[in-house]
Amino acid sequence: MVRYRLFGFAFGLSQLLFLVLLPLWLRLLSYLNPVVLAVVWMCLTVFVVFVVYYLCKETVNMPKRVIKILLSSYSVGLLILLFFRPMHQVYNQINYIPFKTILAFLSGNGNMLVAFYNIAANILLFIPYGVAALMFYRNPSKWQLGIVPVVIILLIETTQYLTKRGTMDIDDLILNLLGIWIGYLLYPVIQKVVRVK
């Protein structure tokens, strides 16, 4: 009974936070696919529930199958964000210079919400993949942890560029990899709450 109350509290808190920040999320719609609301909702809900459980030193047993379903749903949402953007945007640029785009965003000359979203989202949205890699592979090799993510992200960047659904940017690769590596570092913390069955 206590666990249900704790989950109810955590879930309610996450929904309240989502609603309070809804004006901010709605501003992203002019720049991104409307599915961004579902992705943000899912991320915020999971994050808040996790933090509440962690602070209360509670654990949750989760079948690997459920985690795979959640990760698959998340991945579909992320692919929609990456490849189905508003039609008025033009993408035909390539950036091979590390940190050029990041520094341009940090300069403060453009839209600060877009700048923050681009940097933060490129990191945060890839953290679950770092966690999942360690969750699903017991003893991953350096190849699996280092090279495979680089190849996958480069494939995404190339496909975005060729289909004119995004720019090909070395900074996206850097930020996405940073997100995955943060996921690796966070995995021991995640294990304290989520027990995979």
Residue ranges, per PLM feature:
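Bulky hydrophobic segments
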Residues: 1-164, 170, 185-197
